Amino acid sequence: MRRWGRRLRQLAGGVLDLPQDVVLEVPRITMIGHLQMYIENHRGVLHFSEKELRLLLTNGQLIVHGEQLVIRAILPEEVLLEGRIGGVKFLEKP
């Protein structure tokens, strides 16, 4: 059933010419070098420190590792992160 719903959203997105991140409820991540990251379509902050940001996603979590991380702006579905970004990892729900 989950696959059918996902497939239906993909088809609807194609017909309506909607961006895939909106249709599939996945994050859109924009990086400027290794110094800045803009993340859209998250569901909340689970953990933040100067070395790690952990965000809740519809289908799991997004983990950003780095040094001297700072949240410059945060909105209900958007985060602007600055610092030395070292890595990004997706954890899918089982």
What is each model feature region?
Residues 2-94:
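N-terminal intrinsically disordered, cationic/polar leader segments
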